[in-house]
Structure formats: C-alpha cells, structure tokens
C-alpha cells in the first residue's frame, strides 16, 4: 500500500490509498493552534522508508521530532539470545490497518495541540536488518514528541493484530508472543 497522493495546504495527504489513513486527530485546538493530527498510517508489504515518515510529519511549527525505527535483529528476545534469527514473517489480521489508524487517532487525541504523528508497519517476510516499523511524532517541543512517539509505538505493539514468526538459522521457527 502506498500514499501516492499530493498534500493539501495543511500538509495532509490527499488521495490516500487503501490502508493509509490520514487526517485523524484530537478535538478542537487552542486559539491559533491546530489539534494533534495523524498524517500517515499504513501496513506495507514492501520495504519501509524513513524519509517518507519524516517528510509526512514535517511542519513549520514542529520544533522537536521523535523517531522510532524497529529493525529485525539477529537473535530472539530471550534474555540469553538462545536462538540465532535468520529472518521473520509478519502476518496481519484483515482489520489491522483500521486498528492501526484507530490507535494512532487515540494517541493523537491525548497529544498536545500541533502534534503530528505517522506510523508505518511492515508485513510479509523480512531479513535481519530490515525495517519492521517506523513511527514518528513531531511537536513544538521535544518532550511532547518523545512522549507521543513512545506511546504510539507501545499502543501499536499492544493492540494492533500483527503477529510475528521468527525463523532461526537452525531451520526451526516459532511464533512470538502467542499464548495458548
């Protein structure tokens, strides 16, 4: 999924493709300040772009930008890193794009006016070192940007129905975070 549309005068995307959600945000802003807004959300089966996400949140009123980049690491999440990882697969529920947009809108609803958010998550097969998620928040001040970006990533990981299967160099594989 891509967002090939042009931006309007507010910098929000026009003509967003399916799975991309733009323009969601919080309620009324204070005088002279626009409410927080989600400017890009997407699930993609193709490599992610840092530049796309950073460009999406670029605004004259943004003085601080926080960026989170999640990459595929070469070991599992166990404390001892017992398994060497060769890659992983991300699978998404059919509602995942909608839930991603809802989560981002909720986070924007709690962010200071003028804050902008963007998040793109990868699906499909990824090799070690590839980008799995790129999230960013821009705000007038760095503290709000850091806090909003952290909350966005935490909420995406907790609530968006995306599942990860790790593949190990020994040929085995396992689902991560699945409970029976």
Where do the model's predicted regions map?
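N-terminal, polar/charged subdomain of small-to-medium soluble alpha/beta proteins
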Residues: 2-15, 19-132, 146-150, 154-180
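Short glycine-rich or small-residue beta-strand-to-loop segments that form or flank ligand, phosphate
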Residues: 132-139
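Beta-rich strand-turn-strand
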Residues: 141-145
């Amino acid at each position: 999924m891509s967002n090939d549309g042009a931006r309007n005068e507010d910098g929000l995307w026009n003509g967003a493709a399916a799975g991309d959600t733009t323009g969601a945000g919080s309620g009324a802003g204070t005088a002279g300040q626009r409410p927080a807004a989600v400017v890009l959300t997407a699930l993609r089966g193709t490599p992610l772009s840092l530049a796309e996400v950073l460009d999406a949140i670029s605004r004259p009123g943004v003085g601080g930008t926080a960026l989170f980049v999640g990459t595929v690491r070469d070991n599992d999440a166990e404390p001892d890193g017992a398994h060497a990882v060769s890659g992983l697969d991300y699978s998404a529920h059919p509602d995942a794009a909608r839930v991603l947009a809802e989560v981002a809108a909720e986070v924007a609803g709690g962010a200071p006016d003028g804050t902008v958010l963007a998040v793109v998550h990868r699906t499909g097969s990824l090799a070690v070192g590839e980008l799995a998620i790129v999230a960013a928040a821009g705000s007038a001040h760095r503290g709000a940007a850091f806090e909003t970006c952290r909350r966005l990533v935490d909420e995406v990981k907790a609530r968006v129905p995306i599942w990860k299967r790790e593949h190990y160099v020994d040929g085995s594989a396992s689902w991560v975070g699945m409970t029976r």
